Amino acid sequence: MKFLFASDSFKGTLSSARIAELLTTAAKESFPDCICTSVETADGGEGTTDAVLCAVKGERIPLTVCGPLWKPTDCFYGKLDENRAIMEMAAASGLPLLSETERNPAKTTTYGTGEMIRDALNHGFRDISIAIGLSLIHISEP
């Protein structure tokens, strides 16, 4: 028996890779001889950079930027090749970085995303893809 697991992350809780690990463990418990394959997926929000890096065997570039509340925030973007990079706004300016009560567009910033872009340009990347899912620009009033 063969299984293919391709799940997006669960917002703010489990990554696509972790979900695949858990599903593989569960499948192996029920079907010890099964073959499990997984593919990281994402919808343009958190986890997008990791999914793309996994697919193309890219590498993470870590940095610290100004977070959504103007405090230092550790994040990363991805190197696809010498000219191309990928990043997600959620890493520097995303909803997962804020509690429900902190989600106030009058008090938050996306400045850190600009810092990620500047860092990528300083590293020589000229083709930069930016995933905007789960970013602060998606805050809406009920």
Please tell me what each predicted stretch does:
Residues 138-142:
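Residue-level detector of conserved catalytic or cofactor/ligand-binding positions
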Residues 7, 132-135:
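Glycine-rich beta-strand-to-loop/alpha-helix junction loops that act as flexible
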Residues 1-3:
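Extreme N-terminal starter segment of soluble prokaryotic enzymes
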Residues 11-12, 44, 137:
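Glycine-/small-residue-rich active-site loops that bind phosphorylated ligands and cofactors
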Residues 72-133:
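Anion-binding (especially nucleotide phosphate/pyrophosphate-binding) glycine-rich loop
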Residues 25-99:
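Glycine-rich nucleotide/cofactor/substrate-binding loop typically near the N-terminus or early
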Residues 5-23:
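N-terminal beta1-alpha1 ligand-phosphate binding loop
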